[in-house]
Amino acid sequence: MALETLQIEHVPSDHHVYAALFRDVQNVDFLQAQLIGKNPEFEYAFIDASVIISRTHLFAAIFRALNTLTEGTLQTPNVHSDIVIGLSPTNNISESYRRYGLTPSKTRDVLVIKIVYPKLSSENSTITSEQQPTPESIWQHLTTHIQGTPVPLTNEELAKSTDWAKVRKYYKLNGVPGVERIDKADEEGRRKEMEGLVISGIALRGL
C-alpha cells in the first residue's frame, strides 16, 4: 500500500495525515468534477505534483492548514482546500486553486492528502473512531477512483514530477539574486536551495 501516514510535529494526536502520489493520472477531469460538485466522498486535497519540490515543501502547507483548523480560522470550506491554498505565497484563493490544484489536460501526477480528525455529528456528539475512515478504506477508495500508478512519496519520486519553470514563476523566483547561480546539475543542491526560498514565501504570506 503506497498510502503513507505522515508524521508532523505539533499536530494533535487525534489528527491523522495520510498522503499518496499517483503518476500519469488519466481521469483528472473526473476528480476535479467531484471537487466542484462538493462530493463529500472526495474530501481530499488534490495537488498538482509538478509544483511540489520536496516532502518538506508539502509538509509546510499541511502544517499551516492544520494550524488554521485547530484555531478555527480556515480560509476555505475545509482543511483540505486550505492545504491547497497553503502552498501559495499570495492570498489569492482562486489563483491558488488554479496553480496548485487540478487542471484537466495539464495535470499528470497527483498528490492526495487526507486529514482524519474528530468531527461533530448533527447531534453535536463526536464521531467515534469506528466511524472514521481507516488507512485501508482510504486507500481502497483512492485506488478505485484514481486512474493512475501509485508510487512512493519520496523526494526522488517528487523530483520526477517537479516543473522548475512553474515553481520559479509561481513563487516569483525569476531574477532573485542567487537563483541563477544554483547548479542545475546538482539536483539535490538545487532542491535544498529552492526549498528554503519556497517555504519562506509560504511562511511570509499574509504578513
Curated annotation (Swiss-Prot):
Gene3D superfamilies: CGI121/TPRKB. It is found in: Nucleus; Chromosome, Telomere. InterPro entries: CGI121/TPRKB, CGI121/TPRKB_sf. Keywords: Activator, Chromosome, Nucleus, Telomere, Transcription, Transcription regulation, tRNA processing. GO terms for cellular component: chromosome, telomeric region; cytosol; EKC/KEOPS complex; nucleus. It holds the Pfam family CGI-121. Disulfide bonds: none annotated. The keyword Magnesium does not apply. The keyword Transcription regulation applies. GO terms for biological process: tRNA threonylcarbamoyladenosine modification. Belongs to the CGI121/TPRKB family. Component of the EKC/KEOPS complex composed of at least bud32, cgi121, gon7, kae1 and pcc1; the whole complex dimerizes. Component of the EKC/KEOPS complex that is required for the formation of a threonylcarbamoyl group on adenosine at position 37 (t(6)A37) in tRNAs that read codons beginning with adenine. The complex is probably involved in the transfer of the threonylcarbamoyl moiety of threonylcarbamoyl-AMP (TC-AMP) to the N6 group of A37. Cgi121 acts as an allosteric effector that regulates the t(6)A activity of the complex. The EKC/KEOPS complex also promotes both telomere uncapping and telomere elongation. The complex is required for efficient recruitment of transcriptional coactivators. This is EKC/KEOPS complex subunit cgi121. It comes from Neurospora crassa (strain ATCC 24698 / 74-OR23-1A / CBS 708.71 / DSM 1257 / FGSC 987).
